[in-house]
Swiss-Prot record:
Assigned protein family: Belongs to the Teseptimavirus large terminase family.
Positions of Mg(2+) 2 binding: D364, E420
NCBIfam families found in the cross-reference section: termin_lrg_T7
Domain notes: The ATPase region is in the N-terminus, whereas the nuclease region is in the central part. The C-terminus is involved in prohead binding.
Protein name: Terminase, large subunit
Region (Involved in prohead binding): 571-586
Organism: Enterobacteria phage T3 (Bacteriophage T3)
Region of interest (ATPase activity), residue spans: 1-229
InterPro entries xrefs: Gp19-like_virus, Gp19_RNaseH-like, P-loop_NTPase, Terminase_large_su_gp19
GO molecular function: ATP binding; ATP hydrolysis activity; endonuclease activity; metal ion binding
Length: 586
């Protein structure tokens, strides 16, 4: 054997024995930059066979899926008899990983032996490596989490981003996902070398990964985009922080606190831009990998404090009793709230009803870009504020949007249209006024907002919710969820009013999008004076005045039931009309 051949054999042996070395060679072949320190650290963790059940969490854009595909190839090179199952949220995503694995095998000449032989499986979704012995299960199989998981056994299961916004936004969706991942136990070979590896980024505060850690004995290793920014964040990470980062941080926490962990990949300027784009909560989830946000003090606006029920469009009960319990919990509506923040109807309500008193349409005009023109339709009655409709339009204040808003005003027979004048110095009102007049006669009022938006929202809405004076028409929640879409028309729960409401905090940039929420806040602020009424007291006073006025009328006999409106309250009574003498003379 020539000296060159000897050197080649030594290099190949080194690559086969060291995944980090293999990664450097592969990155070079792919014309990628040299692996960064965090990528190298991830490679070491993956190659450590002692990690049997663990969750690898790394910030968006670090390349964890690429590294894991490389790990699959390297693992099969070392032991071609292993069976690996790749599961992703969608079939397409799983297949992309499978295709990339095949491309790696085709790319590196020293991996020729891994190419499928004639007669072996050789498809995108399922293939064998050359030295693999005939077996019921393929060497590599890719499948979506909702696909056909059964029928194969695996030595290693890699769950790559099985949690995405569309399958984790509501409590019902999260429960379904949790049920699906329980199948992994039946698919994993009962061997001491078998492994389950989750790769992912938390999508919600109630992330699947937290449940796995708390209830299934998984360990979590985290590579956040920044070193811990506070003592509280450091305490949350604890032993979860990648050992390399933990050692670096402990040695120089004063200099490293809040600094980028991998400045070659993302420097501070890049990360600041992403924080503005995702909002503080989104950035903390997807770049800091910290789902520990479910704090009642931090997030004061909760769905459970509202009353959600079906509503008549003309009248409503005079008062409600709020008492959240299992009997009045609504599990059919899409719930985008935090964990434990359930949707409830009322416990009981008054038999007396009244016509709605004020009817307003509120508009938060937007400019161009990613903002929506948010709107809300609010009614009032006896100290309660009713949310009848809410939504947003993605195209600023185009003619189409103005027409749609004017039609909303007519549909709900509003008396007043309220808009925020900060945008364009009142220009929206001048543009909208003639369009509104064409469809509906209503007053047009502008409100100028002052101070930090997040503080305004929390300070305005918290008293309404904490006193249970907000009543939400049940279909508003369903429609809001279905219409939450980004500028490209893709479903994005961050545009939902109730997602924005439950993630709002008293800090700058708490949520990335707040257009629907700000419109709702504007309407509540406009109607705030109506909340000064004591619903039960007002109802009693109206009834007492009614009775006092008619106590002196003679009663002749039992008659038929009559209804009438008194001070906005609808009353029912039995009247005698035998001789033309009415018990109550209206």
């Amino acid at each position: 054997m020539s000296t060159q051949s000897n050197r080649n054999a030594l290099v190949v042996a080194q690559l086969k024995g060291d995944f980090v070395a293999f990664l450097f060679v592969l990155w070079k072949a792919l014309n990628l930059p040299v692996p960064t320190k965090c990528q190298i650290d991830m490679a070491k963790v993956l190659a450590n066979g002692d990690n049997k059940k663990f969750i690898l969490q790394a910030f968006r854009g670090i390349g964890k899926s690429f590294i894991t595909c490389a790990f699959v190839v390297w693992t099969l090179w070392r032991d071609p008899q292993l069976k690996i199952l790749i599961v992703s949220a969608s079939k397409e995503r799983a297949d992309l990983n499978s295709i990339f694995i095949k491309n790696i095998i085709d790319l590196l000449p020293f991996l020729d032996e891994l190419k499928p032989s004639p007669g072996q499986r050789d498809s995108v979704i399922s293939f064998d490596v050359g030295p693999a012995k005939p077996d019921h299960s393929p060497s590599v199989k890719s499948v979506g989490i909702t696909g056909q998981l059964t029928g194969s056994r695996a030595d290693i299961i890699i769950a790559d981003d099985v949690e995405i916004p569309s399958n984790s936004a509501t409590q019902g969706a999260r429960e379904k996902l949790w049920t699906l991942v329980q199948e992994f136990r039946a698919l994993l070979k009962p061997l001491p070398t078998s492994r389950v590896i989750y790769l992912g980024t938390p999508q919600t505060e109630m992330t699947l990964y937290k449940e796995l850690e708390d209830n299934r004995g998984y360990t979590t290793i985290i590579w956040p985009a920044l070193y811990p920014r506070s003592r509280e964040e450091d305490l949350y990470y604890g032993e979860r922080l990648a050992p390399m980062l933990r050692e670096e941080f402990n040695d120089g926490f004063e200099m490293l606190q809040g600094q980028p962990t991998d400045p070659v990949r993302f420097d501070m300027e890049d990360l600041r831009e992403r924080e503005l784009e995702y909002g503080k909560a989104g950035f903390t989830l997807q770049f800091m990998l910290n789902p520990n946000l479910s704090d009642a003090e931090k997030y004061p606006l909760r769905l459970r404090d509202a009353i959600v029920c079906g509503l008549d469009f003309e009248k409503a009960p005079m008062h409600y009793q709020w008492l959240p319990n299992r009997q009045n919990r609504n599990e059919e509506l899409p719930n985008v709230g935090l964990k434990g923040d359930d949707i409830h109807s009322y416990h009981s309500c008054s038999q007396n009803t009244g016509q709605y008193q004020q009817r307003i349409l509120v508009i938060d005009p937007s400019g161009r870009g990613k903002d929506e023109t948010g709107y809300a339709v609010l009614f009032t009655l006896n100290g309660y504020i009713y949310l009848m409709e809410a939504g947003g339009f993605p195209d600023g204040y185009s003619d189409k949007t103005l027409e749609s808003l004017a039609k909303k005003a007519n549909e709900w027979k509003v008396q007043t249209v309220v808009f925020e004048s900060n945008f364009g110095d009142g220009m929206f009102g001048k543009v909208f006024s003639p369009v509104l007049l064409k469809h509906h006669a209503a007053a047009l009022e502008e409100i100028r907002a002052r101070g930090m938006k997040e503080l305004r929202i929390c300070d305005t809405l918290e008293p309404v919710l904490s006193t249970h004076r907000l009543v939400i028409r049940d279909e508003v929640i369903r429609e809001d969820y279905q219409t939450a879409r980004d500028a490209d028309g893709k479903h994005d729960v961050r545009y939902s009013l109730f997602y924005q409401l439950t993630r709002m905090a008293r800090e700058k940039g708490a949520v990335a999008h707040d257009d629907r929420l700000d419109a709702f806040r504007l309407g509540v602020e406009f109607l705030r004076s109506t909340m000064e009424l004591d619903a039960v007291k007002v109802e009693a006073e109206v009834l007492e005045a009614f009775l006092e006025e008619h106590m002196e009328h003679p009663i002749h006999s039992a008659g038929h039931v009559v209804t009438a409106m008194v001070d906005g309250m609808e009353l029912y009574w039995e009247d005698d009309d035998v001789n033309g003498d009415r018990f109550i003379n209206w």
